[in-house]
């Protein structure tokens, strides 16, 4: 079974249907029906007529199911060294057990507290001597006389 295509609309023409039109220059056209033939002879552009295949192709109609979904690029995790720490050090820290990490943290906190105490101990004697000299130089505070409000005039409000 030979199926032809309509020269105007682009639809299939099955055997026993359609019309054949031969021009004087020898070119042969197949039309699905009289509607297509008359539109062709009136020199209408099939790309501007809504129901033709050429129009649908031009305006991208009905191709949504054929189009494959666009692939989005996925972010891939990649491990590399950071300034001040090599990759081996980072991996070693990551693979440590939580108990070991907790012990290290507590030790670091203890060391920081001790250094803070040592700093304060060096500061205290100097600060204490400064305070004693300041206390002797202070003047005694004099109590300010309180203002006594004047008696109200005009009776009951």
Curated annotation (Swiss-Prot):
The keyword Ribosomal protein applies. It holds the Pfam family Ribosomal_L24e. The keyword Ribonucleoprotein applies. Keywords: Cytoplasm, Ribonucleoprotein, Ribosomal protein. Transmembrane segments: none annotated. SUPFAM superfamilies: Glucocorticoid receptor-like (DNA-binding domain). GO terms for biological process: cytoplasmic translation. It is found in: Cytoplasm. GO terms for molecular function: mRNA binding; structural constituent of ribosome. Its main location: cytoplasm. GO terms for cellular component: cytosolic large ribosomal subunit. Residues 96-117 have a biased composition (Basic and acidic residues). Residues 123-140 have a biased composition (Low complexity). Residues 94-157 are annotated as: Disordered. Belongs to the eukaryotic ribosomal protein eL24 family. Component of the large ribosomal subunit. The ribosome is a large ribonucleoprotein complex responsible for the synthesis of proteins in the cell. Component of the large ribosomal subunit. This is Large ribosomal subunit protein eL24. It comes from Gillichthys mirabilis. The lineage of its organism: Eukaryota, Metazoa, Chordata, Craniata, Vertebrata. The gene is rpl24.
